[in-house]
UniProtKB/Swiss-Prot annotation:
Keywords: Cell membrane, Cobalamin, Cobalt, Endoplasmic reticulum, Glycoprotein, Lysosome, Membrane, Transmembrane, Transmembrane helix, Transport
Organism of this sequence: Gallus gallus
Extracellular side, ranges: 1-7, 69-97, 163-185, 324-361, 427-483
BP GO terms, sorted: insulin receptor internalization; protein localization to lysosome
Pfam families named in the record: LMBR1
Name the record gives this protein: Lysosomal cobalamin transport escort protein LMBD1
Family: Belongs to the LIMR family. LMBRD1 subfamily.
């Protein structure tokens, strides 16, 4: 029992270290993008908290895999302390950890973040008393609470039974997975709500992460245009616009007023001139900065990172394609959510992770790296595209200039994407997520000189769907991902969409030229007040 406590303590100690790193990262990440001029304490704290909770929930995945793997020895036998009661206790600890974090996520998505968002919307429109702003924010937030309540009610009573097919052992195995997860209505309701949010996270991942996986590495490889060259072009544009304004105004030298068409043209040209002069100030700042010289010095390193990221992106895409193809060919079909027990078509990541787990904690490091890679590529996609509602761009995400409302949107999108990350990792490495590095004993007859003898030996074999139920422990993560077969079917088709969007984004990113050295920092719809936050940290 002492050994069990030691193993459990080791896993949770590493989780604690990951928690500390996540809190530091979330604080730096939010502070990096928030507007210094419009910074608000409550929105900053909310954004940091929401992002940290999402990352912490993703950090539970490797802890779950670590604990089920360390219950068994490499020879396929259970460790002395890992009896049935202890194993169930450890599994339940991880499961309760998931439900605690997921309950907090529901609180953030359906109550806290909407309330803070609407509060600041009201604060901008009405400078009246705080009580009135809080009441209005609560009124709008009530709609989100209603949606949450509906999801919980549906989840509590939605049927979990998968359609019955006779004479199929695969169907029987899939059904056992659903039965093992339990039938508590409260936990089922929570699972349904989280799965619904994960579907939204899947859509966000298809939109932003898939594009960011191609845009981020190619931008690193191509680099940015020269600040001096851009400034020269900008100066020429300023002179051209000034001359056009003078030509139009020269029409009224004899006292005649300008026509309405000419007045509109002058107004548009003057707005264009203001934008160009703002660009001039930004380019002058960046051209004189030491940061530009530093970026030029590390240019070879950025190219190396870009090549590495594009290789990783292609590796992920190939692994995801092979995993989805395996489901299409060997799963029980649509009615089971394309659930597959074991792997028939292996992929690079599914082969690599069990090997790394033998040298603890390399697999933990790789999983953390994968999660962070998804976060960075998602952020790259959001920053390049902005936050859109259909064809309307709501907010732009810019370093040091992001409004409080946009920051809340950003963290909610990242929170939903990270929720979907667990299924993405399962899609990339299904065998690893299901069993980790567990092995079980298989009986084998020993032969001597080609003659079978009555000597029975046992050899260790990697856990798969053919293993006896009492010999291999399925992770709580895997069971949680497949609690509702219809969500699994949605995730399956979402993976194909993810691959398609990545390939389209790769083509678009290849066709685009170099980015401006001040890309996204100066737009025509910006106010001149935004220049109060001039920054040299563009590259």
């Amino acid at each position: 029992m002492a050994a069990a406590a030691s193993e459990l303590l080791t896993g949770w100690f590493l989780f604690g270290l990951a928690l500390l790193a996540i809190l530091i990262f979330s604080w730096v990440y939010v502070r990096k993008y928030q507007s210094r001029r419009e910074s608000e304490v409550i929105s900053t704290v909310t954004a940091i908290f929401a992002l940290a909770v999402a990352l912490i929930s993703s950090a539970l995945l490797p802890v779950d895999i670590f604990l089920v793997s360390y219950m068994k020895n490499q020879n396929g036998t259970f460790k002395d302390w890992a009896d049935a009661n202890v194993s169930r206790q450890i599994e339940d600890t991880v499961l309760y950890g998931y439900y605690t974090l997921y309950s907090i996520i529901l609180f953030c998505v359906f109550l806290w973040i909407p309330f803070v968002y609407f509060y600041y919307e009201e604060k901008e429109e009405d400078d009246g008393n705080t009580c009135s702003q809080v009441k209005t924010a609560l009124k709008y937030t009530l709609g989100f609470i209603t949606v949450c309540a509906v999801l919980l009610l549906i989840g509590a009573f939605v049927p979990l039974d998968i359609p019955n097919k006779k004479n199929s052992t695969e169907w029987e195995k899939v059904k056992l997975l659903f039965e093992e997860f339990g039938s508590s209505h409260g936990l089922t309701a929570l699972s349904f709500s989280i799965s619904s949010l994960t579907v939204i996270g899947m859509l966000a991942a298809i939109t932003y992460t898939a594009y960011g996986m191609s845009a981020l590495p190619l931008n690193l490889i191509k680099g940015t245009t020269s600040a001096a060259y851009e400034r020269l072009e900008n100066t020429e544009d300023i002179e051209e616009v000034e001359q056009r304004i003078l030509r139009i105004k020269s029409k009224c030298r004899d006292g005649r007023p300008l026509s309405s068409r000419d007045r509109r043209a002058v107004q548009q040209l003057e707005e264009r001139l203001r934008t160009l002069r703002r660009r001039e100030r930004h380019l002058e700042t960046i051209e004189k900065s030491w940061w530009l010289k530093f970026c030029e010095a590390i240019r070879p390193l950025k190219i190396v990172w870009g090549v590495f990221f594009i290789i990783v992106a292609l590796l992920f895409t190939v692994s995801l394609f092979l995993s989805n193809l395996d489901k299409a060919l060997h799963s029980a079909g649509f009615d089971s959510g394309f659930i597959i027990l074991g792997t028939n078509l292996t992929n690079p990541l599914n082969m690599l992770l069990p090997v790394l787990q033998t040298v603890f904690p390399l697999d933990y490091i790789l999983i953390t790296t994968i999660v962070m890679y998804f976060i960075f590529t998602s952020m790259a996609g959001i920053r390049n595209m902005g936050i859109w509602f259909f064809w309307i761009r709501l907010y732009k995400i810019r370093r040091g200039k992001t409004r409080p409302q946009a920051l809340l949107f950003l963290c909610m999108i990242l929170l939903l994407i990270v929720l979907h990350t667990s299924y993405m990792i399962y899609s990339l490495a299904p065998q690893y997520v299901m069993y980790g590095s567990q092995k079980y004993l298989v009986q084998s007859n020993k032969t001597i000189d080609g003659q079978p003898k009555n000597v029975t030996t046992f050899v260790a074999k990697d856990c798969d769907a053919d293993a006896p139920e009492d010999q291999c422990i399925v992770t709580r993560t895997y069971l949680f991902l497949h609690k509702f077969w219809f969500f699994s079917a949605v995730y399956y088709f979402g993976n194909w969409a993810f691959i398609a969007v990545f390939l389209i984004g790769l083509i678009v990113s290849c066709c685009k030229g170099k980015k401006s050295v001040i890309e996204g920092e100066v737009d025509e719809d910006d106010s001149d007040m935004s220049d109060d936050e001039l920054s040299a940290y563009y590259c």
